[in-house]
Design a protein with these regions (language model features):
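Bacterial Sec-dependent N-terminal signal peptides
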Residues: 1-9
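A short Gly-Trp-Pro
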Residues: 8-137
Length: 137
């Protein structure tokens, strides 16, 4: 199959995931934005369950990995295996590691290491608008 057709199919597949998102969700998930600190619906959520990608419902984080980091966004010290891809991010004049959904490539937030906030020494800093919480039944 010619390269152009493969790229076109991928674009169509990806855009379908994002069709039902609100404008604000698209700004975060598709345009790689960041929601205002302390504004996210899941920041203080302590219920048991799972967090999935808002765009494609790919399981991302178990609630057991969520912790209070006082950074203004939901934080997790572990991810579900193969749920997330990491990308170098040089925006805003600094080097960071962006995290995206491994299924739809939607922007989730950034990952930080070496802060000493948990025993795993890692913080997935996630936009609430990028995720959906599924309560444990």
């Amino acid at each position: 199959m010619p390269f152009g057709l493969i790229a076109q199919e991928k674009e169509i597949k990806s855009s379908n995931y994002f069709d039902d998102l609100t404008l604000e969700e698209r700004k975060i998930i598709v345009k790689k934005g960041t929601e205002r600190a302390w504004s996210g619906i899941y920041l203080s959520n302590t219920d048991k369950g799972m967090y999935v990608c808002k765009a494609c419902n790919n399981p991302l984080f178990n609630s057991d990995s969520k912790f209070k980091s006082n950074c203004g966004w939901p934080s997790f010290d572990d991810e579900i295996d193969k749920a997330i891809i990491r990308k170098q991010d040089y925006s805003l004049g600094m080097k960071r590691i962006e995290i995206c959904c491994s299924n739809c490539d939607g922007h989730l937030g950034h990952i930080f290491e070496g802060e000493g906030l948990t025993d795993k020494n890692i913080r997935h800093c996630v936009n609430s608008l990028s995720i959906l919480f599924i309560p444990k039944k």
